[in-house]
Amino acid sequence: MTTWRWLVLGSAIFLTACAGSPGRIKTPAVDATSTAWLSQGKGDWPSAHWWAALHDARLQAWIVRAQKHAPAMLVAAARLDEASAGSQLAKANRGASVALDSSVTRERFSANSYIPPPFGGQFYDDGELAANFHYDFDFWGQQRHALNAALGEVRARTYELQGQADWIAARVVSTYLSLQVLQQRIDLLQKRQKLQLALRDLQEQRVAAGLRAADTLSPVRQDLLHLTQDLQDAQAQRDQLTIDLQQWVDLPLTQLQVSPRPLPTLLQTVPSHLGLDLLARRSDLAAARARVEAAAERAKVARAAFYPDVNLTAFAGWSSLLLSRWIDQSSMTMGVAPAIHLPIFDAGRLRAHLDQAKAALVSADASYREVLLRAIREVETAQVQAAAAAQQRAQLALRLAQAQRHGARLMQRQAAGLSDARAVLDNQLEQSSLIELDEHWLQEQLLAQVAMVEALGGGFAVTESPCCAGKATQRKSHDR
C-alpha cells in the first residue's frame, strides 16, 4: 500500500472517531437579575473582623478559640487538604513520567517449547535494567480541563472554610449578646420582684387595717408568683445559653460567666450597589459558583474523551540472559513507541459519561441559583427584622417617657399628701415592664444586626488567587 493510501486510511479513521463528538460545553453565565430589586442603602460592607467593633477583648478571644477548635472547622480544613491534593495529582498528570525499572529472573527454559536444546532444559538468568519515559499529548485539553476542575474544587473548599469561620463567629457573637441582654433582664426582674413585694406588703397592711377587702390580695399575690416564675425561667435560659457558649469555645463553665456591662451597638446597614456585589461577598455563593465552573470543566473532560489520545513511550537500558554480560554495550536496548488511541466503537460509553457530566453541571447551576435565592431571602429578612425591632423600641421609648412623666407627677402628689404609695408603686412596675419589653426588642435588634452582617457575607470577599495550599489556608483561617 502506498504512502498516500495510508494517509487516506488514517484520515478516514480519524474522522470516524470524531464523527460522534459532541458540541461545545458552555459554563452557565452568572444570573444576578434576582438581586436587582434588593433595596439599596448607604452603608458599607462588613469588615473581615466586624466583631472588633464591639470592643470586647474577651469576646474576640472566644471567637478565635471557637474557630480554632470547632470540629466543623477541622472537617472543612481536611476537605480543603483533600481538594488540594487532588489538584496536585491533576497537575502531575499533565507532565511526563520517567521510571527506572530493574529485575533479575532465574528461569528454566522448557526443552519442549519454542527454545530447543541445548538451550532448552537449562537454567538461565534474565537481567533487565531500563529507564522508561511516557508522555500524553494534551491536544484536546483533557488534562487542562481536569486541572481546572480540580482547582475549582479547591476554590470552593477554600470559600467554605472561610465561610465556616465567619458562621462560627456569628454564632458566638449572637450567643454572647443574648447572654448580655438576658443578664440585664434578670437584674430588671429582680428589681421588679422587690417592687412587687413592697406592693404586696402595702396591700396586706391595708387589708389588716380594714381599708381594703381581703380578696384584693389575690391579684397582687398572683402577680408576684408570675414574676417569680419569669425570673426562674430567665435564669434557666441564661444557664442554657452559657452551655451553648461552652460548646463553641470549649472552656469550663466557670470561665464563661458574663458580667453585666453596657450593651454594644451594631450599626450594620445595607450597603450601596447591593445586588451584583452580593455575589462576591458571600462565601456560600462563591463556593457554589466555583462548583459550577468545576462541573463545566469536568464536562469538557468528558467531551475531550471523544477525540484520539496520542502518547509517546520510550525506553533505554540493558537486557541479557547472562548476568556476566548484563551491562555490556552489546546488551543495550532502546526504543521509541508513539501510539494513538481512537475511540471508534466506544461512543456509547463516552456519550453516557458526557451526559452524566452535563447533568452534574445542570445540578451545580441549580444549586448555585438556590443558594442565591436563599442569600437574597436572608438579606431581606434581616432588613425587616432590624426595622421592626427599631420601630418597636421607638414606640416603647415614647411610652416609657410618658410613664416617667406620669410617675414624677405621682411622686409630687404623694409628697403633698394627695396620693398614697400604691399609685407610685404601680407606676414604677409599669416602667419596669416597659423597660423589660425594651430589653426584649433590644435583643431582637442586636440579633437582627448580626444576621444582617452574616447575610452580607460577614466580611468575606472573593480573591483572585485560584488555588492555595490546604494546610496554609487552614492556619490562616484559624488565626483569624
Write out the residue ranges for each language-model feature.
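Hydrophobic membrane-targeting signal helices
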Residues: F14-A17, L195, I340-H341
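Membrane-embedded segments
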Residues: A78, E82-A85
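Small/polar-residue-enriched beta-strand and adjacent coil segments characteristic
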Residues: H49, H55, W62, A77, ...
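Hydrophobic, well-ordered secondary-structure elements that form the walls
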Residues: L312, I340, A357, A364, ...
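Periplasmic alpha-helical coiled-coil/stalk elements that build and connect Gram-negative outer-membrane
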Residues: Q143, G152, Y159-L274, Q385, ...
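Terminal intrinsically disordered/low-complexity segments used for targeting and assembly
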Residues: T2-K68, L151, Q235-A280, L322, ...
